Every structure is written in structure tokens, then in C-alpha cells.
């Protein structure tokens, strides 16, 4: 059985979603790698991405009744992942929000199935955690319960304090976060694939400087 986390990282490299080199993060840090989930932007890559999400969610063991995708990136993730979960025998409804409320038709900021039961939030990454916090407020305002958060990559980086954005969400809300892959998985990829050997030490140094346990 192959490691789907490694398969996901290799797939991300093939799609140029994951790149090695010298990049500057939003926090102003010099990073030896860059991950841009927005480049999963055609039917085939989105389908494969949704398969990875579905597998990661199932293996996480998180109990949930439906998916919620925060606008905008989470919208397609929720829809596509719901379809792939259905193929695996887990048929759940999904919903998403608008950035601005609509005053005609169905109105409001929520679209899709009513938010009920245990709601799993799905997004690409957790950076500042703003999207997750807003999603939790929406879910709780509808009388539903946040079940956890599914993301593509956990960079495992310290924020302003000693915790990463993912750890802060886990600590503040008591919610499990299920990434398809993490910085640890990326490190394993570099160790096991000599063609990426030149980036092993820069990633090791970056992890030592900014990483969390």
C-alpha cells in the first residue's frame, strides 16, 4: 500500500502547486518551498485533489455529518470532496458561504444544505486562522457543531507565539485538524528522493528556525 501523503506531495510537485527554491512568505520569512493550492485549477487536478481529501478525512476518523467550505477556495473543495466521499460510500451534504449576503432569491450568506449536526470545515491551508474562526461562528450561529478542519498542507510553522496556526485552532476550539500532508511528510519526501537532495538542508534549517513539534 502506498503512502497517500507522499503521493499527494509528488502530485503537488507535478502540478507546480508545490515548488522548491527561494520564496518570501506573507509573514516576510524566506522559505525554501512554496505551496499554492490555487494551481489545482482544472478538472483532472481538482478530481485527484478531492480523492486525497476524501482519503485523508476518512483515515482521520473524525465524526461528521456534512462538509462546509468557506468562500472562496473552500467552495469547490467542499463540492468535489463530497462527490469523492460519496464514491467511497460516505454520502454527506455540503454547504458554503458567500462573502456578501444576498438580498433576493434564497438570500443570506449560506448556500447548499442546511448546517446541521457535526460540520467538518474544509479549506486549503490554515494561515492566520481567520477563515476557520469565521466558519465556526457561522456554524454555531445555525445551531450546528464544528467537528474539525480538513486542510491540504500543514506547514507546521510558528505564528507570532510558540504555536502554529493549526495548533492555535486545535487549542482554542478543541477541534482536530486533519491535513493531507505536513512539513514532516515533505521532509520525508526530500530524504527519500535524491533528485530533491539540494533542498533537504534548506528545509531542515527552515524547520529548525520556524517549525513546531
From Swiss-Prot:
Any one annotated GO CC term: cytoplasm
Record flagged with keyword Protein biosynthesis: no
Enzyme class, UniProt record, top EC level: transferase
Cofactor or coenzyme needed: Mg(2+)
One Pfam family in the UniProt entry: Pribosyltran
Molecular function GO labels: magnesium ion binding; orotate phosphoribosyltransferase activity
Pathway(s) it belongs to: Pyrimidine metabolism; UMP biosynthesis via de novo pathway; UMP from orotate: step 1/2
Binding site for orotate: 34-35, 127, 155
Sites where the protein binds 5-phospho-alpha-D-ribose 1-diphosphate: 26, 72-73, 98-99, 102, 123-131
UniProt keyword terms in alphabetical order: Glycosyltransferase, Magnesium, Pyrimidine biosynthesis, Transferase
GO biological-process terms attached to the record: 'de novo' pyrimidine nucleobase biosynthetic process; 'de novo' UMP biosynthetic process; pyrimidine ribonucleoside biosynthetic process
PROSITE patterns: PUR_PYR_PR_TRANSFER
Family annotation (Gene3D superfamilies): 3.40.50.2020
EC number in record: 2.4.2.10
Catalytic activity: orotidine 5'-phosphate + diphosphate = orotate + 5-phospho-alpha-D-ribose 1-diphosphate
Subunit description: Homodimer.
Entry's family note: Belongs to the purine/pyrimidine phosphoribosyltransferase family. PyrE subfamily.
Function: Catalyzes the transfer of a ribosyl phosphate group from 5-phosphoribose 1-diphosphate to orotate, leading to the formation of orotidine monophosphate (OMP).
Cross-referenced PANTHER family: OROTATE PHOSPHORIBOSYLTRANSFERASE 1-RELATED
Name of the protein described by the UniProt record: Orotate phosphoribosyltransferase
Species name: Neisseria gonorrhoeae (strain ATCC 700825 / FA 1090)
Amino acid at each position: 500500500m502506498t503512502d497517500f501523503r507522499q503521493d499527494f506531495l509528488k502530485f503537488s510537485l507535478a502540478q507546480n502547486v508545490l515548488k522548491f527554491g527561494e520564496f518570501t512568505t506573507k509573514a516576510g520569512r524566506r522559505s525554501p518551498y512554496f505551496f499554492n493550492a490555487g494551481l489545482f485549477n482544472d478538472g483532472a487536478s481538482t478530481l485527484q485533489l478531492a480523492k486525497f481529501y476524501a482519503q485523508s478525512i476518512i483515515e482521520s476518523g473524525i465524526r461528521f455529518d456534512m462538509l462546509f467550505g468557506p468562500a472562496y477556495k473552500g467552495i469547490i473543495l467542499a463540492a468535489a470532496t463530497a462527490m469523492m466521499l460519496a464514491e467511497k460510500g460516505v454520502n454527506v451534504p455540503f454547504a458554503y458561504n458567500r462573502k456578501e449576503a444576498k438580498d433576493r432569491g434564497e438570500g443570506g450568506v449560506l448556500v447548499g444544505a442546511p448546517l446541521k449536526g457535526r460540520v467538518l470545515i474544509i479549506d486549503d491551508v490554515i494561515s492566520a486562522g481567520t477563515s476557520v474562526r469565521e466558519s465556526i461562528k457561522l456554524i454555531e450561529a445555525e445551531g450546528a457543531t464544528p467537528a474539525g478542519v480538513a486542510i491540504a498542507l500543514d506547514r507546521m510553522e510558528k505564528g507570532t507565539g510558540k504555536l502554529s496556526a493549526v495548533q492555535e485552532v486545535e487549542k482554542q476550539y478543541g477541534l482536530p485538524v486533519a491535513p493531507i500532508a505536513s512539513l514532516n511528510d515533505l521532509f520525508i519526501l526530500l530524504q527519500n528522493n535524491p533528485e530533491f537532495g539540494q533542498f533537504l538542508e534548506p528545509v531542515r534549517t527552515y524547520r529548525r528556525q520556524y517549525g513546531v513539534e
